[in-house]
UniProtKB/Swiss-Prot annotation:
UniProt xrefs under Pfam families: Guanylate_kin
Residues engaged in binding ATP: 25-32
Domain Guanylate kinase-like: 18-196
Single GO molecular function: ATP binding
Protein name, per record: Guanylate kinase
Subcellular locations according to the entry: Cytoplasm
Cellular component terms per the entry's GO annotation: cytosol
Similarity comment: Belongs to the guanylate kinase family.
Main EC class the enzyme belongs to: transferase
Gene: gmk
Function: Essential for recycling GMP and indirectly, cGMP.
Length: 221
């Protein structure tokens, strides 16, 4: 464990404000898989979005998403309960404001798996608290293969995702980092490195002032 990883222990986390670590990509570029790999060995908590999308057989309500009706979603939206929300592929997605604010205040870092619309909202509302990465496929041919390989969507849905991918990829320049996902393990390693580097930013580490003062005052025999 590195110095800054150890400083992110439960003892130190309450001494700094957390941040939002955002991954975006067109469907099939590997965003969800990379998110799962990152959560295994990085000190991140996953943001669980609220959605009106139909639950897939492999998904668990409350873990992958909070699945709600369109009426329930609109009620929460109109009540200003979302810090960000968007309509993607004909479905609503949103992030509950209270859960995010509580996590950041407690010094916890939150992983977001959201599209460019949600990212833009978070960047505007919380500019000092966001770190964003856009994930690109190595080619459109590979993107098509991945969508078919997933075997969880109908052909009509796949066609819609491919059409929307062209719009989504135009927003890459508004992100802090861009990763071309040619190799899953290499991409995961790169993204973890970006996360660890961001935890070491001086502005995030309020404990450093007292730590350095202690070093300076420490007696040398």
């Amino acid at each position: 464990m590195t110095f800054f990883e150890s400083e992110l222990s439960a003892k130190k986390r309450d001494q700094r404000r957390g941040f939002l670590f955002i991954l975006s990509s067109p469907s099939g570029a590997g965003k969800s898989t990379l998110s799962r790999l990152l959560l295994k060995d990085a000190q991140l908590e996953r943001s669980v979005s609220v959605t009106t999308r139909q639950r897939r057989p492999s998904e668990v309500d409350g873990f992958h998403y909070h699945f709600v009706s369109k009426q329930e979603f609109e009620c929460k939206r109109d009540g200003d309960e979302f810090i960000e929300w968007a309509e993607v592929h004909g479905n609503y997605y949103g992030t509950l404001r209270k859960s995010v604010e509580n996590a950041l205040s407690a010094g916890r870092d939150i992983l977001f798996d959201i599209d460019y619309q949600g990212t833009e909202q978070l960047q505007k509302k919380m500019p000092g608290d966001t770190v964003s990465i856009f994930i690109l496929p190595p080619s459109m041919k590979e993107l098509i293969l991945r969508l078919h390989r997933r075997a969880e969507d109908s052909q009509d849905i796949i066609n819609l995702r491919l059409k929307n991918a062209q719009t989504e990829m135009q927003h890459w320049r508004f992100y802090d980092y861009v990763v071309i996902n040619k190799d899953l393990n290499q991409s995961a390693s790169l993204i973890k490195s970006i996360y660890l580097a961001e935890t070491a930013r001086r502005k995030r580490c309020s404990f450093l002032e007292s730590f350095v003062d202690g070093l300076i005052d420490e007696k040398i025999n």
